[in-house]
Each structure stands twice: as structure tokens, then as C-alpha cells.
Amino acid sequence: MDQEALLVGRTLLKRGIPTIPFILASQALEKLAYFGLVPNMILFLTVEYGMGTAEAANILFLWSAATNFFPLVGAFIADSYTGRFPLIGFGSSISLTGMVLLWLTTIIRPECDKLTNVCQPTTLLKSVLLYSFFALTAIGAGGVRSSCLAFAADQLQPNQTSRVTTSSLETLFNWYYFSVMVACFLSQSLLVFVQTTYGWQIGFGVSVAAMALSVALFFAASPYYVRFQKPTRNSRNPWKLCRVQQVEDLKSLINVIPIWSTGIILSLVTACQVSFIVLQAKTMDRHTFIQGFEIPPGSYGIFLVISFLLFLGLYDLVIVPLLSWALREPFRLGVMVRMWAGYVISVLCISALAATEYARRKTARDESGTKLSAMWLLPYMILGGIAEALNTIAQNEFFYSELPKTMSSVATTLSSLNMAAASLISSWIITIVDVTTYGSWITENIDEGHLDYYYWLLVGLSLLNVLYFVWCKKSYGKCSI
């Protein structure tokens, strides 16, 4: 037994474990490249392609929905047909190709009339390149994000039948999410600054370089990866034989769907308003206490990330220990309580944004020419980060504990499905609002529109969502955690 354990340890030290940093670094660089494009994309579409605000927002919502939905498809393909390594390699290469196509749109000069010197905002070729970028990066995300974390966990196993210790998995997950958050921080600060200061060509070029490095790092360690064989013929289509266990798994999934659906509005309130916030920040006073320095419009989302991280640290390291000491017994908020608190805070969050937009528009239309400070966006960012920290982690704990162990991979992808559904619903709401208000709420010049009315509509939906969650909680009954 000791010789077998020693052999297993040697196998992991030679092959699997040393490759984990390559996988995590590759994943972090993919996130850096992708999220570095997101904040300013609304400006790129409206300025370089001459799109209206509503049209550009709809395109970005659909792109976000596809990017968050395809990982579920990728997970099914990897588990049933291809295995994880080929799918990650394919997804990374496809994403890189898409980003190169986007970068090419910044090189192609617009067609200009020599007499009038009037230039067309876009051409057919540039439009084809743009939409190809959206399609390829969405498909690529399905390959990379569906399998990267699971493939890293595979490196802790010398063979397909061995088990991974809980402490090893916890360490891996901690490093994974830490690397992702660092990538998000850098993308919304460094990359957005480069785009704002040096232009689209250099800014998008940095994302291409980061994605190219991601692909290179992933394939660099390919001879040393632990790779499990793809499923056999008998296991390729397991749903052809509908066993009792599979029926029970399906019942468990159906039971948690109502609770899952309550998270859609929260994602709509926090993550789906990034594009509009960039447009707001662009028209506000972004000066800081550092003389001569302005925060780029696309970088304000970084405050939501900081709020998320700070609240998590404060909750785990200060609030819980202090309350446990005061009560003289272990203190812990249940998942349902944390979800409810997240939904209540989301109402305050979007209300703060609506009030800020009302004040911003009123100040902008004032003939004095003054601008409202962009720091008034911080209440929305801070409350949004707290709401996400409370709700997202609680939902993940709930799904992981309530669904059978055979559905652990499904449990970890439900959060991304929330974002996909929220992006689709956002697109529908924007379309309906734009049609019913005859374009008077969401306009190309937001000073002339009523973006605050749109936000108050989201406040109403958030209030209804709180009531809906209470009903779902009562219907579900008592959960195991």
C-alpha cells in the first residue's frame, strides 16, 4: 500500500501538479483578454460603427448571453465526446482568431469621399469582421470556460478512478478564483486605460497579445498533462438508458430551478448595466484627488470587484468571528438568508443608480455647464458588489448541496446560466422599452433621453423579485444547509 501511494505521488509530481500553474495562468490571461474588451465595447460600437445606444446595448447583451450559455454546451461535449484537453485547445484558438478579427477592424481605414471628405462609419467587411468576432469568442468561451477548472482538477488525479482530497480541491479552487479576480482587476484598470489613452488599435492589440500568450502557455505543458480517455461507446449517450438515478437527478434539478430563476434579476441589475454606466461616466466629472488624472469611463466597474472582494474578506474574517465570539457559539447565516439579503440590497443598488442618473441628467441640462462627479456612481458599485457577494456564493452553495453529487458539474454552471438568461432578458427589455417609448428613454445622446426611467423600471422588477423569492423559498421548504 505504501509503495502504491509512493508511486501515485511520484506520478503527480512528474506530470499533473506542475502543469496546474500553466492552466491557471492560461485561464487568467483568457479572462484578461476578454474582460478587457467588454467595458469600452459600447463606446467602440457607437463611435466607430455609428450604432445607436439601444442597438449597441442589444448586441452586447446577446453576446454576453451566448458567452455564458456555450460553456454548458461545451461541458456536455467534453464529458460525452471529446474530453477536456482538445476542447480547451479548440476554444482558446477560436477565441484568439476572433480577437485578431476585431483588431483588424481598427486597421482598416474607413471609406471617405475625396470631395466632401465625409467618411462612412463602417463597411461590409468591417461589419463581417465584427460579427465574426462576437460569434468566435462566444464559441471559444464555451470550450475554455466549460473545462478549464475541471481539467486543472484532473491534474490532481493520477488515474480516472482515484479520488482527490477535499483540501487539495479547496486549495485549487481558491487559487483559481484568485487568478480570475486579479485578471478582472487588471482588465478593468490597465487594459481600459490603454484603450482610452492610446486608442483602439493598441488597446485591442494588448488583448490579442494576452490571448496569444494564453494559448501558448496552455499548449506549452501539453506533454505533461494528465489526460483521461474520452468516454467509451457505451457511455457516450447515457440518456438513451434512462436509469432510476437519472430520473431522480432530473427531479432534483427541476426542484431548484425556481430558486435559480430568482438570481436572473440580480444579474440583470448588476452585471448587465455595465454598458450604460460607461456612457454615464463618460459625461460626468471623472477627476480624482490626483491632479490631472481622470478615471477612464470603462474602469468604474472595478469598484464593484473591489466591493465584492472587500465584503467577502470582512464577512469571513471579521463579522463571522466577532458574532461567534459574542454569541459563544459558531455563527453562520443560512444560504436562504444570504440570498434574500442580496435581493433586498439589489433594490437599494439600482435605486441609487436611478437617483444618480436623475441628478446627472438634470446637471448636464443645466446651462451652467457643470458636470456631476462620477463618484456618485460608487453607491451603486458598492451595493452591487455586496449583493453579488451575498447572493452568488449562497446560490452556489445551495446548488452544490441540494443537487446530487452526480450533478456537481451542472451545479457549478448554473451561475453562468443566470447571466446568460439575464443578458437575453435585458435585450428584450431594451427592445420593448425602445419601441413603446418611441426611443425617448434610451437615446444616442443620453442627456436627451430618460435612462433614469429605465432604471426605475428595474427597481420595480427587483421589488417583485424579492416577493417572488419569498414565495419560492416557502414552496421549496427546508434545505439541507
Swiss-Prot record:
Tissues where the protein occurs: Expressed in roots.
Primary localisation category: membrane
Gene3D superfamilies registered for this protein in UniProt: MFS general substrate transporter like domains
Record key words, sorted: Membrane, Transmembrane, Transmembrane helix, Transport
Pfam families: PTR2
Gene Ontology molecular function: transmembrane transporter activity
KW Transmembrane helix (keyword) present: yes
Transmembrane segments: 32-52, 57-77, 88-108, 124-144, 173-193, 202-222, 259-279, 302-322, 333-353, 374-394, 422-442, 451-471
InterPro entries listed in its UniProt record: MFS_trans_sf, POT_fam
Subcellular location: Membrane
GO cellular component: membrane
Family stated for the protein in its record: Belongs to the major facilitator superfamily. Proton-dependent oligopeptide transporter (POT/PTR) (TC 2.A.17) family.
Protein name in UniProt: Protein NRT1/ PTR FAMILY 1.3
Source species of the chain: Arabidopsis thaliana (Mouse-ear cress)
